[in-house]
Amino acid sequence: MAKYLSGANFVGNFTIEGQSDKLPKPEAYTISKCEKLPQPDMYRLTARIKYGDIDSEVPLDLKILWAGGTPVITMDAFWIPGMGTFGARVLIHANRYSGTWQHDEVGGHLFGVIKKD
């Protein structure tokens, strides 16, 4: 998993629940490095996060669980410096990603493709 995610670019869109009349908004995540941590199911992803007015690179210690052979990036009340507290479930399959996200009282869906340089 660490090798697959290192150098991966997640490029896609996100929606905001309750705003179905609006088009999805663009998002991009570049994982420059992913390394397995000693704790079970834990990985450190050094990621550049771009959405809205945000463009920042941060280290994220995240749990990656497995649904059979499918990895699911898992965040529960996870604080990201300069961005806030988030929850998410992001499923990875066949060089695509999809999932749900939550930021305080606001949430929605996210989806896109995973590209490697």
What are the functions of these language-model segments?
Residues 4-117:
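Central antiparallel beta-sheet cores of small beta-barrel/beta-sandwich binding domains
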